[in-house]
From Swiss-Prot:
The keyword Secreted applies. Keywords: Lipid transport, Lipid-binding, Secreted, Transport. It comes from the Eukaryota. Expressed in hemolymph. It comes from Galleria mellonella (Greater wax moth). GO terms for biological process: lipid transport. The keyword Transport applies. This is Apolipophorin 2. It is found in: Secreted. Signal peptide: none annotated. One of its GO terms (molecular function) is lipid binding. Its main location: secreted. Constitutes the major component of lipophorin, which mediates transport for various types of lipids in hemolymph. Acts by forming lipoprotein particles that bind lipoproteins and lipids. GO terms for cellular component: extracellular space.
Length: 21
C-alpha cells in the first residue's frame, strides 16, 4: 500500500521507498 506516499514517490515495495524515505 502507499503508506509511504506522503514522503516517498513510490510504493512501499519499490526501491523509491528506501531512497525517498
Amino acid at each position: 500500500d502507499d503508506k509511504c506516499s506522503i514522503g516517498c514517490k513510490g510504493s512501499a515495495t519499490a526501491p523509491t521507498f528506501l531512497n525517498g524515505h
